[in-house]
């Protein structure tokens, strides 16, 4: 859950987001070391009075500054590719949910169930109950079972949208005429918020997403009550 003046990422809710957080820290450490080295070299050049006017080339130095950046790029690329393939891999999902973007709301269809569909609109500020979040609450939450692999099929009925849940490391474009998919699995129960992350018109800011992750027994009771 985000909070005011937050500096870091949201707490990870899914295994994918945990991997992305580790990769972020790994990359940031490399960037910090490179920046420190560059600043040290610049400060040394500005403060020293020694010069090398007779130096025309330095093969050893040129070899080092060619090989070293290549090794650094490999250190960044390998974990990045691993996470990329993890995000794209969907093996035997326990549940499939199809979500369609509209101007300016989301509709959901649980394809494993017959006639389990609904639209999800933002609750206007004047209708909020005490404790509810402004611009983030919806009239129909997406209830899903926790600790189970879920496949999300994402598309759009009109213009470009983007279905994003930051705490789960999810951001998938909703493109008219194209069906994109994403893997979702929560390691803990709770409410998780997201928003449309593609400018889609005048009410783009009013397309929140709310996932309610619950134990399997509660999900079965909820789905049975709607059928």
From Swiss-Prot:
It comes from Dugong dugon (Dugong). NCBIfam families: CoxB. Belongs to the cytochrome c oxidase subunit 2 family. It is found in: Mitochondrion inner membrane. Residues 46-59 are mitochondrial matrix. Component of the cytochrome c oxidase (complex IV, CIV), a multisubunit enzyme composed of 14 subunits. The complex is composed of a catalytic core of 3 subunits MT-CO1, MT-CO2 and MT-CO3, encoded in the mitochondrial DNA, and 11 supernumerary subunits COX4I, COX5A, COX5B, COX6A, COX6B, COX6C, COX7A, COX7B, COX7C, COX8 and NDUFA4, which are encoded in the nuclear genome. SUPFAM superfamilies: Cupredoxins, Cytochrome c oxidase subunit II-like, transmembrane region. Its EC number is 7.1.1.9. Its cofactor is Cu cation. Cu cation A2 binds at residues 196, 198, 200, 204. The keyword Electron transport applies. Binds a dinuclear copper A center per subunit. It is a multi-pass membrane protein. The chain crosses the membrane at residues 15-45, 60-87. Cu cation A1 binds at residues 161, 196, 200, 207. It holds the Pfam family COX2_TM. Component of the cytochrome c oxidase, the last enzyme in the mitochondrial electron transport chain which drives oxidative phosphorylation. The respiratory chain contains 3 multisubunit complexes succinate dehydrogenase (complex II, CII), ubiquinol-cytochrome c oxidoreductase (cytochrome b-c1 complex, complex III, CIII) and cytochrome c oxidase (complex IV, CIV), that cooperate to transfer electrons derived from NADH and succinate to molecular oxygen, creating an electrochemical gradient over the inner membrane that drives transmembrane transport and the ATP synthase. CDD domains: CcO_II_C. Keywords: Copper, Electron transport, Magnesium, Membrane, Metal-binding, Mitochondrion, Mitochondrion inner membrane, Phosphoprotein, Respiratory chain, Translocase, Transmembrane, Transmembrane helix, Transport. One of its GO terms (cellular component) is mitochondrial inner membrane. This is Cytochrome c oxidase subunit 2. Gene3D superfamilies: 1.10.287.90, Cupredoxins - blue copper proteins (2.60.40.420). Its main location: mitochondrion. GO terms for molecular function: copper ion binding; cytochrome-c oxidase activity.
